[in-house]
């Protein structure tokens, strides 16, 4: 058995070895969403807090009487709760604020213990070390293993130790995740999402982008691209997709990434790790093929569909890391290679949501597909311009 600390190191690809703490979900076969949720549980599951929007992800994550979330051998696992469709981000922010408040109480009690005469010197050293490293997840895990037996042994004699023992669940730095689909994130819950990232708090938002309201039957959302047939866009959507990620970068202090696991597993893993490590709000937009897309190859090929989407330019991979700007580097990193644009139309025709336009509205299909390709090229060229900007020169001035 591989030791979890070894697996967690950068020398290993942890997602290949760590035990998933999200398993056997009731999602559709080939669902493009669940691999991302599973990966996050492998990386941070033993200290993960999840605020889940209502939608597909809440159904397969919490259908009574079962849940795919589980625990490791120590009894640690994700803490999951579901909120309404429109306020999932605020719900997650509330979790984070409550956690901050309780940890601030821990700091207060530990400082009082350090200043008192009731605690031995070795206790005070460990308390001081925890205060100095309270935002370091791995260090707090290590220190929690020392602190818990110490305070449990002394709690009957020392009131400070008793208070710390009562708050021991807050010793390890938690990883706060907010999970929802594109309907919740781009549309109904967008105001809340914007409010939460503007707060500057250390939360991680995962948008499972299926480009439709999946759970309610495939209605059009602001994430639905030009030309796709969906409910409320029966003749093919006529306006371009909202660029939620690029909008979030305008704050300048939000970590943002667009990922597609089937296209680039390394980039997906790197983006998720960077987002969680970033000491502020992060937004990850993950491309997720859905049964509503009508993949002609079948949902068993959903990972391959993600790869095709990136290669033809339908979906783009990039990361925006504000920490790089502090080093005088360009925070925007374009991870997609130059697309094979000649494959773009073929990709559209491989999904029923686009192919249906050709059957039902042949006169308009060519125009819509051309517009979809032009929009994709326009967006990719915009990303290329952002990636080329000379941040070193700006910093030197």
Task: Give the location of each predicted region.
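Single conserved hydrophobic/aromatic residue that forms the stacking wall/gate
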Residues: 1-8
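Beta-sheet entry/capping signal
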Residues: 20, 46-51, 56-59, 175-177, ...
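Flexible, low-complexity linker and terminal segments
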Residues: 73-132, 288-397
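Iron-sulfur-cluster electron-transfer modules
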Residues: 9-161
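Glycine-rich ThDP/TPP pyrophosphate-binding loop and its adjacent helix/strand module
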Residues: 156-158, 172-178, 187-204, 208-338
